[in-house]
């Protein structure tokens, strides 16, 4: 079983209705949702699941997480989690290789978080290199 937390940027690529339809799940996205927060929902989402997977993990969310920022529901749940986070990076090869991103990756690994990927391959920008999002089946295999 799983829960979905979508960031504001998620909805630039996929609509909330489509995400709920294909997942057949409620999609959480608002940090200050009154109904959810009556029961401290961000803590429940962070702790009531066996695994937490960030898919895809942009340079932005990796950097914010490494610095402990909690400016949306996803990051707040990641910080509140009592387990390692599984992070699947997806970005341009130059972004992935940037020393600032690599320092944040190192810091998160030192704190016990796991990185799944990125793969080498064709990137969304048309280039080839490291930074490609791993296939969903790879995430499932890593979590077994």
Where are these regions (language model features)?
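A cross-family phosphate/adenosyl-ligand binding-site feature
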Residues: 1-86, 93-144
